[in-house]
Amino acid sequence: KSPESLEGSKAVAYIAVADMSSAQWDIWSINDAAMEGTEDAFRTPSEVYSEASWPIVANAGFFYSSGGKNYSSSLAVRNSEILAYNINYASEDWVTMYYPTRAAFLETETGAFDACWTYRTWDNHYMYPSPAENTWDAKPADQPSATYPEGGEEFAARTAIGGGPVLINDGKFTDSYVEELFNGASGIGPDSAQPRTAIGVTVDKKIVL
């Protein structure tokens, strides 16, 4: 647990470290792969913990309810099955449409870990080493594809969780909340003090929550 003050502000923060040479990382999510909403009930961290007594359970991703259905706005992959995708459009006025790439933290089939940005079209699901250059202050960037942003490849993961923004990538400060369109109309308030959860991995394969 953190001290009562961090960088001059009051804080209640916790950190947990898992050595992935012996630990297991898993997720739970509603199944909304069709992005049409589901009657699957959301679960609290306490409910997930009670089923398996995990040493550490943390909330993750973005989600909401509407019209009697539950929706996920963030990628979720478990045992190589995609349960939900990151959102693939956003707008401030529902006239001008943007197509943001959103963050993902994933484990590959070989046990390697990575942070990336993802986008799902109707026919394909891509992952990128950098985000699409979107900002609410400019016209929408091109819709992501196999060739934009550069370095795109077909998405593949054994386990993954979306949300965002990416804060650190390859050891460098990134914080792509502008490109991921988390400011402004999103209501996320990335530059304000709010409860947050973060996940990352060290070079020696220790997951940090």
Task: List each language-model region with its residue ranges.
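Short beta-strand micro-motifs enriched in acidic
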Residues: 108, 200-202
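Generic recognition of flexible, low-complexity loop/linker segments
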Residues: 45-46, 153-156, 184-188, 196-198
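Electropositive phosphate-/nucleotide-binding environments in soluble metabolic enzymes
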Residues: 39-42, 161, 189, 193
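C-terminal soluble interaction/assembly domains
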Residues: 207-209
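Short glycine-rich loop/turn motifs
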Residues: 10-15, 102, 162-164, 193-198
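Active-site-adjacent helix-turn-beta-strand microarchitecture at beta-sheet edges
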Residues: 66-178, 183-184
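C-terminal structured interaction module
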Residues: 194, 203-204
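Zymogen propeptides
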Residues: 1-117
